[in-house]
Amino acid sequence: MRPLSVQSKFEDVATSTSVNHHGVTPQSPWHSPVPYLFGGLAAMLGLIAFALLILACSYWRLSSSGEEDGQNVDEEKESRSGDKAANGAYEEKFLVIMAGEDLPRYLATPAMKKCTCGGHEGKMVISQEESVAKEEEKMREGEEEKVKDTGETTTTSH
């Protein structure tokens, strides 16, 4: 006769699961990209919130300093005007990059051409002030000569 072996079902399940666990290691949740995605998103939102907090605090500080009785406002204006005077020389300079290997970068100050056309409204004046004055003198001399020749007086409005 055959020997009878009686085993319960629970023992079979226990032995079969233990065999499967020995061959496969359990997978860590950090092997998935999802935690890294949400972690990066949380870090980015945290940095944005921190920047907004700093911006709000600086705005609050500026608005509260303007509400004072004006005790320190004059001192701040004086210090700001001193800063402007110190930075005035550098304020109107531009970086110019030129072609070449020797000193290709310069700080350039923009030059404005001054208009010398005070009394010549609507006319194009190309000459300098001295030559304009000479031309006006010649015109006056020409008018005086005409007056002497004709003997009549003319009025000129300047």
Curated annotation (Swiss-Prot):
Ranges in the topological domain labelled Extracellular: 1-36
Basic and acidic residues biased stretches: 131-151
Family that this chain belongs to: Belongs to the GLUTAMINE DUMPER 1 (TC 9.B.60) family.
Lineage: Eukaryota, Viridiplantae, Streptophyta, Embryophyta, Tracheophyta
Comment, domains: The VIMAG motif is necessary for the function of the protein.
Keyword ATP-binding among UniProt keywords: no
Biased composition, class Acidic residues, residue ranges: 66-76
Note: Overexpression of GLUTAMINE DUMPER 1 leads to free amino acid levels accumulation, plant size decrease, hypersecretion of glutamine from hydathodes and to a full resistance to geminivirus infection.
Protein name: Protein GLUTAMINE DUMPER 1
Domain of life per record: Eukaryota
Alphabetic keyword roster: Amino-acid transport, Cell membrane, Membrane, Transmembrane, Transmembrane helix, Transport, Ubl conjugation
Post-translational modification as stated in the protein's UniProt record: Ubiquitinated by LOG2 (in vitro).
Tissues with expression: Expressed in the vascular tissues and in hydathodes. Expressed in the phloem and xylem (at the protein level).
TM helices/strands, residue ranges: 37-57
Location of region: Disordered: 65-85, 126-158
GO-annotated biological processes: glutamine secretion; regulation of amino acid export; regulation of amino acid metabolic process
Parts of the chain on the Cytoplasmic side: 58-158
SUBUNIT field: Interacts with LOG2.
Name of the coding gene: GDU1
Localization per Swiss-Prot or TrEMBL: Cell membrane
Topology term for the membrane: Single-pass membrane protein
